[in-house]
Amino acid sequence: MRPSGRKTDQMRKISFERNFSKHAEGSCLVKFGDTHVLCTASLEDRTPPWLRNTGKGWVTAEYGMLPRATGERIKREASSGKQSGRTQEIQRLIGRSLRAVVDLEALGERQISLDCDVIQADGGTRTASITGAWIALHDCLKWMESRNIIKVDRVLKDHVAAISCGIFAAQPVIDLDYLEDSAAETDANFVMTGTGGIVEIQGTAEGKPFSQEEFLTLLGLAQTGIAELVDLQKQAIAG
């Protein structure tokens, strides 16, 4: 039995609130159960130095947690003067995931920066960030299209979403919350496109190694879950 009472293949309640920020070109408050992340997309008329005069744009991401996003206050990384390795890893993952579905040449020589700020954490912050950031990116591109800067369907090639899966209490489960994640025997994150392409898989055995059969079971759970997330994204942007 999962602590939340969910079935092994049941995700938490997922919701997207678009246009959460009045200033950003695109924004979305994404909720995976009690994990809440504010994702904003900002258009910048510049590119990294290595892309200047190439005709290509760039999509990048930053990730952070508010001090009381967790049970005990965590120190702001800005006050320590450096980002943790975990923060750097997660924001690079978010950026890679979004670039996988963007035509950087069609974007042109400009940059879109995604900021993913965790308001409340209960497991799965990176997967929620990726899934919500896609909506913020989409809405930023729609903002650009409304000003005749780009065509969305030329820049945004597909959906992208992410979900965690793991082995908890000897059972493969999807969308782990904090209680499950902290006690999981195996923990994995899957990032996939709307057409089923695999962008990234991160998997770790916390205790005994997991078998190929167990991995394929987790992959199957992730494929089903991400298909559901993509459907929810489609519903959100159609509203």
From Swiss-Prot:
EC number: 2.7.7.56
Matching Pfam families: RNase_PH, RNase_PH_C
Residues annotated for phosphate binding in this entry: R86, G124, T125, R126
Keyword annotations: Nucleotidyltransferase, RNA-binding, rRNA processing, Transferase, tRNA processing, tRNA-binding
Protein name: Ribonuclease PH
One record GO biological process: rRNA catabolic process
Reported function: Phosphorolytic 3'-5' exoribonuclease that plays an important role in tRNA 3'-end maturation. Removes nucleotide residues following the 3'-CCA terminus of tRNAs; can also add nucleotides to the ends of RNA molecules by using nucleoside diphosphates as substrates, but this may not be physiologically important. Probably plays a role in initiation of 16S rRNA degradation (leading to ribosome degradation) during starvation.
Alphabetical list of SUPFAM superfamilies matching this protein: Ribonuclease PH domain 2-like, Ribosomal protein S5 domain 2-like
Keyword Transferase: yes
Record note on quaternary structure: Homohexameric ring arranged as a trimer of dimers.
Family affiliation: Belongs to the RNase PH family.
Record's catalysed reaction(s): tRNA(n+1) + phosphate = tRNA(n) + a ribonucleoside 5'-diphosphate
Keyword Lipoprotein: no
A GO molecular function held by the record: tRNA nucleotidyltransferase activity
PANTHER family referenced in this protein's UniProt entry, alphabetically: EXOSOME COMPLEX COMPONENT, EXOSOME COMPLEX COMPONENT RRP41
